[in-house]
Regions:
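Short beta-strand edge/turn micro-motifs at domain boundaries
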Residues: 90-109
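Short, low-complexity N-terminal intrinsically disordered segments enriched in polar/charged residues
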Residues: 1-26
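A short gly/proline-enriched turn/hairpin at secondary-structure junctions
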Residues: 32-42
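Surface-exposed, charged secondary-structure patches
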Residues: 48-92
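Hydrophobic/anchoring residues in structured secondary elements
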Residues: 34, 67-69, 107
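Short beta-edge strand/loop motif at the mouth of beta-sheet-based domains
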Residues: 41-49
Length: 109
């Protein structure tokens, strides 16, 4: 199944799979927060560092499976495959949108 995504999220996932950190970070507000693996990454500088670190560490690709949207919140179920034990895995990406940008991303199982 292909998930129907808001434009900013479709662009974010395409950039993620291309490992294009510049295009990935363009999806976020200046003061955005990403919560992943128990840590918060606040602001575009910290988020850019997190993106670079995770790409280098896991060399991953992500495939959106399904999505749901309620106002400014979009939840996307993804299949994530890469260089880590148990690959591929299914994760939930919960986005809070602010206009056409991502203000918060929470990644969890």
């Amino acid at each position: 199944m292909t998930a129907r995504l808001p434009k900013v999220l479709a662009e974010y996932f395409a950039a993620t799979n291309a490992h294009d950190v510049g295009a990935m970070i363009a999806a976020f507000t200046e003061g955005a927060t990403v919560h992943d693996e128990g840590r918060d990454h606040v602001g575009v500088t910290a988020i850019r560092a997190w993106m670079t670190e995770t790409i280098d560490k896991y060399d991953y690709q992500v495939e959106p499976i399904e999505s749901a949207r309620d106002g400014s919140r979009a939840v996307v179920l993804v299949s994530l495959r890469g260089r880590f034990p148990g690959s591929p895995i299914t994760l939930q990406y919960a986005f809070t949108l602010s206009g056409e940008k991502v203000a918060r991303l929470e990644i969890g199982g």
